[in-house]
Swiss-Prot record:
SS bond list: none
Family: Belongs to the RecO family.
Protein name in UniProt: DNA repair protein RecO
PANTHER family: DNA REPAIR PROTEIN RECO
Organism of derivation: Pseudomonas putida (strain ATCC 47054 / DSM 6125 / CFBP 8728 / NCIMB 11950 / KT2440)
Entry-linked InterPro entries: ARFGAP/RecO, DNA_rep/recomb_RecO_N, NA-bd_OB-fold, RecO, RecO_C
Function comment: Involved in DNA repair and RecF pathway recombination.
NCBIfam families in alphabetical order: reco
A biological process term (GO) from this entry: DNA recombination
Any one of the GO CC terms: bacterial nucleoid
Signal peptide boundaries: none
Keywords: DNA damage, DNA recombination, DNA repair
């Protein structure tokens, strides 16, 4: 019988399951895993909360596994205020966009570092935009910020629109939702101090993610608006 192997993990989401169990979605380097935690009200159940660095052993070959062991591996990333809402936003992105049981070790590493940075109180917007971009890239949805859809260099004085299925397209007529070339070039260099860069990055990532997230609103985004 195959023995479970411990792996690092974070809880993305959990809910009550039957009388004393919980259905838990974990994020691990091996992907998003769903498992049943028996006796969820016991001492181990106190670890079933977001942003706690864990080591878990999961049993089972199907999509719904069982937690055979779960231990904390360090100090939790205590998030408060807007940092907490930001962390919940990251979790919701992973829940909505990651296919089940598909390995994404690079995203896992970047997620861990982003949680640490949020806990340290670093500026939120650059952290969120960087994570969104890395997520799009790892999922195969990224596009060039240096070249347009016709393989021409992004011009600082140009205007561009995002074609989600292809990339950035230069346009001549002013219309809603466009991006200035100088802003796109700043984003390509992760120059968050450039005028307009953070706002442009937020608009660009929202447009890029929308088609993959679908019509259902993000709960974390609504919570952030109502804070």
């Amino acid at each position: 019988m195959e023995q479970p192997v411990g792996q690092p993990a974070y809880v993305l989401h959990s809910r009550a399951y039957k009388e004393t169990s919980a259905l838990v979605d974990f994020f691990t380097p091996q992907g998003r895993m769903r498992a049943v935690l028996r006796r969820a009200r016991s001492k181990g159940g106190s670890l079933v909360r977001p942003f706690v660095s864990l080591e878990v052993e999961l049993r089972g070959r199907g999509e719904l596994k069982n937690v055979s062991r779960m231990d904390s591996t360090g100090i939790a990333a205590w998030l408060h205020g807007d940092a907490l809402f930001s962390g919940l936003y990251l979790n919701e992105l992973l829940m909505r966009l990651l296919p089940a049981e598909a390995p994404f070790p690079t995203i896992f590493e970047h997620y861990t570092l982003t949680l640490q940075a949020l806990a340290e109180g670093r500026p939120l917007e650059p952290l969120l935009r960087s994570f969104e971009w890395r997520l799009l890239d790892e999922l195969g949805y990224a596009f060039s910020l240096n070249q347009d859809v016709n393989d021409q260099p992004i011009a600082a004085d140009g205007l561009y629109r995002l074609r989600v299925d292809a990339g950035l397209e230069r346009v001549e007529l002013l219309q809603p939702g466009l991006f200035r070339g100088i802003e796109l070039l700043a984003l390509a260099e992760a120059d968050w101090d450039a005028p307009g860069a953070l706002l442009a990055a937020k608009r660009l990532m929202r447009q890029a993610l929308a088609v993959h997230l679908g019509a259902k609103p993000l709960v974390s985004r609504e919570l952030f608006r109502k804070r």
